[in-house]
Amino acid sequence: LNVLADMYGTDKIIPATVEFVDVAGLVAGASQGEGLGNKFLANIRECDAICHVVRAFESSTILRADGATKTDPKSDIEVINTELMLADIATIENHLPKVTKELKSDPKLRSTIDYLTSLQSQLLSGDIPDSFDDEKLHGLDLLTAKPIIYLFNVDENGLTDQTQQAELARIVINTNSAGDVVPARLQQDGNGASDKPRNDGRTERSQESLSPAGYPQVVFICAELESQLRELSVIEATELLADYGVTESGLAKLAHAAYDILGLQSYLTAGPKEVRAWTI
């Protein structure tokens, strides 16, 4: 955009945007009304995708929802996923009688009933499917069917600690995939996917690009560093990122992940009045 603005001699630059809505935190038992309960779940239901911010740094002054100071990303992720699954199980349970009633007039609904029953059983076993049959969901808008980004909030060292990042990525894969998946080598700066053949003929991708085949996106960000970057010029921010061994801000990584997981892309228009990026 800046290059086009220079070419056309305009100062008006309108970038593409992705809107993130900050909803209240989720606690265990939300599906039964604990905490903000149904209000939280309703807020998620209105979103196109879920971005789960997971604390992955140690601090003696920051408490988890259960009052503990020790960081436990695996437990935090399991709490969220469990509540989403329980909410979806209840949704399917409430919907099945309606579909069953309609079966008399529409025998084709038998496959839908079988699918929903199987899906409910899978969720009851604690397994989130890698893919969903949207046609058979009948507009249920299940929470577990939404694409998800796991945003791990790490400390400064975590931005380049490939061992820590690989461990965190394994938590996500083990939590969401029914298959035996081993993460590929992590891209140090997260600037793109690194495809790698698997023994079963499928393709692995780097930890920060796990959206294919139902896998989530994984992004590592240091919120403390991001707050510093907001106060700096572009040149100063670039220099600070270089000091930490990364080439892209966490905010930029998150935007790219959101575009990828939602299947969005941008096209540009330019002229003497403005340069604009459009989202499609």
Task: Give residue ranges: language-model regions.
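Conserved nucleotide-binding/hydrolysis micro-motifs of P-loop NTPases
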Residues: 1, 25-27, 55-61, 68-70, ...
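Switch II of P-loop NTPase G domains
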Residues: 2-49, 57-74, 78, 132-139
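Conserved beta-strand/loop subsegment of P-loop NTPase cores
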Residues: 19, 48-55, 76-97, 144-153, ...
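Flexible beta-alpha connector loops of hexameric P-loop NTPases
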Residues: 26-32, 69, 80-84, 103-107, ...
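Amphipathic alpha-helical coiled-coil segments with heptad-repeat character
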Residues: 37, 70, 77, 82, ...
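Charged, amphipathic alpha-helical oligomerization/scaffolding segments
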Residues: 46, 91, 115-118
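C-terminal-of-GTPase-core extension/linker across diverse P-loop GTPases
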Residues: 98-176, 186, 195-196, 201-280
